[in-house]
C-alpha cells in the first residue's frame, strides 16, 4: 500500500525498547512522526490509513521487533447493519443528547475522566494524568478534531449532566476515535459500545466510509468487545481486510503472560531521551 505525503519528507523516530506493559516478559517499541502544522490533516489521513494513531501532534504505531499482536481496526460504516442487541444499546441511551463542541478542555470533562481512570484503569499509564496533560491531549493538535459530549436531557435551560465524552478526529474517509471516557458506575448503558455505535451512525449520516477504532489484540479479554462489531476490518501486511470468524475467536499470541488492552496505550510516552532518529 503506497502512501504519498503532501509535505516535506517526514522524519520518523523509534522509541528505545522498554518493558511491555501488556505482555509480561516482552519489550515494546513505537515508531512515530511529528505532524506538520501546514498540512497536518492530510498527513494524518494518510498515516491513519496505514495503521498510525494520533496523540497531540504525534502520529505513532507499534514497531515491536518480535511481536505483531496489535492490529489496527476500523468499522466499514457504509456496510454496517445494526444488530438487535446493538439497537438495544442505542435505545438504552436515548435519554442522552449528543453535543459536538470545539476541542477545548473543561474541568467538567477532566473530572469525568478522573473518575473513569481511577475506576477502570487505576494501574494504567494514564492514571496520573493532570489537568495540563488533559488540556494538551485535547487542544494540542494540527488536525481537524472535536469533542462529542453525551449529556442527559436537561430539565431546565442549563446543560444536562455529562455522562460520556470522546475526542474524535475527522478524516477524509471517516472518523477516528482518539480517546473516550464515561461514567464508570452505569454498566447497563454499555457506554463504550454505545459511543462506537453512535459514531457508526454519525458516519452513515455523513456518508463517511469508516470509523477507526484503534488497535485490536487477538485473545485480549479487555479488547474482546471490538471483535463483536461486525463487519470489522483489520490492517494486515497486504492491506485492510474483513475480520474472519476464525479471527474473532482467536487465541492469544503465544508467549509468557496474559494480554492486556493495547488500546490503553499511554497517549504520549515517547520522550526525546528515548528516541532514535530513523533518517
Swiss-Prot record:
Task: Tell me the SUPFAM superfamilies matching this sequence.
Answer: Acyl-CoA N-acyltransferases (Nat) (SSF55729)
Name listed for the protein in its UniProt record: Aspartate/glutamate leucyltransferase
Q: What EC numbers are recorded for this enzyme? A: 2.3.2.29
Q: Which organism is it from?
A: Caulobacter vibrioides (strain NA1000 / CB15N)
**Reaction catalysed by this chain?**
N-terminal L-glutamyl-[protein] + L-leucyl-tRNA(Leu) = N-terminal L-leucyl-L-glutamyl-[protein] + tRNA(Leu) + H(+); N-terminal L-aspartyl-[protein] + L-leucyl-tRNA(Leu) = N-terminal L-leucyl-L-aspartyl-[protein] + tRNA(Leu) + H(+)
What keywords were assigned to this record? Acyltransferase, Cytoplasm, Transferase
| Role played | Functions in the N-end rule pathway of protein degradation where it conjugates Leu from its aminoacyl-tRNA to the N-termini of proteins containing an N-terminal aspartate or glutamate.
**Where does it mainly reside?**
cytoplasm
Q: Provide one Gene Ontology biological process annotation.
A: ubiquitin-dependent protein catabolic process via the N-end rule pathway
Which top-level enzyme class is recorded in the Swiss-Prot or TrEMBL entry?
Answer: transferase
Family, as annotated: Belongs to the R-transferase family. Bpt subfamily.
Q: Where is this region: Disordered?
A: 245-279
The record's subcellular locations are: Cytoplasm
What's in the GO CC field?
A: cytoplasm
Query: Which GO terms fall under molecular function for this chain's record?
Result: arginyl-tRNA--protein transferase activity; leucyl-tRNA--protein transferase activity
